[in-house]
Amino acid sequence: MEVTHGRGYVYSIQYHIVWCVKYRHKVITEQIENRLIEILSKIAEDNGFQILECNTDKDHIHLLVNCSPQHYIPDMIKALKGVSARLLMKEFGEELKKKLWGGHLWNPSYFVATVSENTEEQIRKYIQNQKRK
């Protein structure tokens, strides 16, 4: 686990974040997954945090995120879910709307947990093995 030095503080903050497709419909194809990961990486870069691990199953996504104390979790997740939903619905709308109605890609809720240096490797492996279950 990497320790970062800021002006007047030192930190190491990581979160395991999970959210699901609306109605848990299995709509995340390989093509959608690849584009989703591109979009999320750009959002993280634009907002000054890092996605250390990212993997999906057909109906949900797992992220391991590294951020600073200035990042507010609800704002990070709002940006990740909101921008990705808008862009994916724009690019894959015809395909997605077959299973999703009302124009919503993501379920409004999410899971977030802090990650310690003792659990980081376990979380990484868990995320990496999502499709292998």
Give names to the regions the model predicted.
Residues 1-133:
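Basic nucleic-acid-binding interfaces
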